Amino acid sequence: MHPRRPEGFDGLGYRGGVRDDPAFGGPFHARSFGSGTELGHWVTTPPDIPGSRNLHWGEKSPSYGVPSAPPTLEGPAEEPFPGGGDGPRPGRSSEQLNRFAGFGIGLASLFTENVLAHPCIVLRRQCQVNYHARHYHLTPFSVINIMYSFNKTQGPRALWKGMGSTFIVQGVTLGAEGIISEFTPLPREVSQKWNPKQIGEHLLLKCLTYMVAMPFYSASLIETVQSEIIRDNTGILECVKEGIGRVIGLGVPHSKRLLPLFSLIFPTVLHGVLHYIISSIIQKIVLLILKRKTCSSHLAESTSPMQNMLDAYFPELIANFAASLCSDVILYPLETVLHRLHIQGTRTIIDNTDLGYEVLPINTQYEGMRDCVNTIKQEEGVFGFYKGFGAVIIQYTLHATILQITKIIYSTLLQNSI
């Protein structure tokens, strides 16, 4: 379980550009976790719009209370305005264009990850929990066909159900992590000069966060796989209500096959932590490769300002894309097991992913994670762990296409402005 947003940004940090008021934040001091040096940004948790502030390679967000130094500019030095006025500065319009362009690029990426990809997530989860299915939908062609059938028989809402609850789960996860880190010495970030103790404390924070968000994740999963045919018009906060009811034992009655929350802790935390570790490692590797490639190309030949701006925005987006793709593919079998354990005993009715119409009940009787793995292997084969994998292919193909289109549009705007 994890936030759909890959965690690699600086949250409220600010990169590039000069603060108009260098004294801002003076009375506040950054928290330190055993070191007075500035923490390097290996991984960060708060979500941010990628590309909106990382204007140049190697720059970091200034710490609170430390005035940011003006960036080094190529070409002749600009004379400051007399009296420190806020009059128009040379190159200010270009700088604002870069910021708004970066904001737009990041917004397009977030929109693709959380909105356009949601139908793929819905169908992927329905296929994962459907142990009745004879068609595994391992290719995107069969997935597109079943999507069309659902849309024809139930309307567009069949593919967009539960989207609000996914945002709630992300908010609960980030909020829980922030609160726990504020009241405990567990760090939200890991410095470049890390040590095993710091890594362990950071991963412990992640484990506690996933445990807190687990009941809400379970409620969100039910909303995304519940058939629209028998679905009631529930409010957007129904996920919160069901999550709290799952903890205190109230709410909609469940069957005796419902697994207790403590038996779901291990698979949920295992999936979340592994997803986080794999994403972080892949992201750092891809960023390092792209950075070296960019530096070597800059040394080999002089690059245009347009290329410099593209190199400032897109490597981080590409790294996040690759990290999310690799972690989803590697952990797909574990995610299938996790979703079946969460959905068991909740009396959920799902759509028939073989026919595109009719509904099916979920009547599994897994005793735990090991029993679920063995049962899937015996009754459905190895490919039973990959049911609905074609939806992942569609999801990331769509994401890559949106990134490429955004890059083309941004390059065109830069060519017209230079």
Swiss-Prot record:
Gene3D superfamilies tied to this protein: Mitochondrial carrier domain (1.50.40.10)
GO biological process, one term: synapse assembly
Record field: transmembrane: 103-123, 167-187, 202-222, 258-278, 314-334, 382-402
Positions of modified residues (Phosphoserine): S32, S35
Any one GO cellular component localisation term in the record: mitochondrion
Its membrane topology: Multi-pass membrane protein
Subcellular location as annotated: Mitochondrion outer membrane
Modified residues (Phosphothreonine): T45
Residue runs in coiled coils: none
Tissue distribution: Widely expressed. Highly expressed in hindbrain, spinal cord and brain coronal sections containing corpus callosum, fornix, optic chiasm, thalamus, hypothalamus, midbrain, pons and cerebellum.
Recorded GO MF terms: protein-containing complex binding
Pfam families, sorted: Mito_carr (PF00153)
Positions of region (Disordered): 46-96
Primary location recorded for the protein, binned into one broad class: mitochondrion
Positions of Solcar repeats: 96-187, 311-416
Record note on quaternary structure: Associates with the mitochondrial contact site and cristae organizing system (MICOS) complex. May associate with the endoplasmic reticulum membrane protein complex (EMC).
Protein's job: Transmembrane protein of the mitochondrial outer membrane that controls mitochondrial organization. May regulate the assembly of the MICOS (mitochondrial contact site and cristae organizing system) complex which is essential to the biogenesis and dynamics of mitochondrial cristae, the inwards folds of the inner mitochondrial membrane. Through its interaction with the EMC (endoplasmic reticulum membrane protein complex), could regulate mitochondrial lipid homeostasis and thereby mitochondrial fission.
Similarity comment text for this entry: Belongs to the mitochondrial carrier (TC 2.A.29) family.
Protein name, per record: Mitochondrial outer membrane protein SLC25A46
Organism: Rattus norvegicus
Gene: Slc25a46
